[in-house]
A protein has these predicted regions:
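Phosphate/NTP-binding elements of NTP-utilizing enzymes
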Residues: 1-196
Length: 199
């Protein structure tokens, strides 16, 4: 058993609201430096401990962005490379791009640069997915990824987004969270947006 205690840091008030929200699709908006990637990593760590065996996926557009904003900070916070294995809070498998916790929880890291790459997500199943910088993705990408959030276990099934104004996905993000105009198969009660205190 790891002998270390995880320090989650101190979230800002809006980050606390995002972290404790239980809507099915929760978005966190704000400018650069607003703590969007940090809040994703924090939520992923909390859920990994709170729900043993849970599977979570963090998605960014490119692998370098994924590495810089999530893999490096999370493996560092969880001391995945500590020379004393008893102080490691989790194990990182670079070939599988997966962090595994002693309780069986997993955080998977995936990138999605183009719509033609969606085939790589065929058959993918997870309990929670994080779409970081969601406005960089098309609506078809979002809907395909949202369909991966499923399963028969008792874990919560949610999608968390972070977003900035602009980008190829600006209109669908605005439709869901600002204009709140929904298609026939969408539930207005599923979606909620928080904005960063630093925005």
């Amino acid at each position: 058993m790891p002998s270390e205690v995880l320090d989650l840091g101190t979230p800002q008030p809006k980050q606390v609201e995002f972290l404790t929200d239980t809507h099915n699709v929760v978005a966190f908006g704000g400018a650069r430096g607003g703590g969007k990637s940090w809040v994703v990593d924090c939520k992923a760590k909390v859920m990994s401990y709170a729900c043993p065996g849970i599977t979570q996926i963090i998605v960014r557009k490119t692998y370098p962005e994924l590495t810089e904003n999530h893999i490096v900070p999370l493996t560092r916070a969880l001391q995945c490379y500590h020379p004393d294995r008893h102080r490691r809070l989790a194990v990182y498998n670079d070939s599988k791009k997966t962090i595994t916790f002693p309780n069986g929880s997993r955080i998977l890291f995936r990138y999605l640069e183009r719509e033609k790459d969606l085939g790589r997500f065929q058959g993918t199943e997870c309990d929670i997915m994080y779409l970081d910088e969601a406005t960089q993705f098309t609506e078809d990408m979002f809907k395909t990824l949202w369909a991966c959030v499923r399963g028969t276990n008792s874990h919560p099934k949610r999608m968390y987004l972070t977003c900035n104004p602009g980008g190829v996905g600006h209109q669908w993000v605005k439709r869901l969270f600002i204009d709140r105009v929904y298609d026939e198969n969408e539930n207005p009660e599923d979606c909620l947006l928080y904005t960063s205190d630093a925005a």
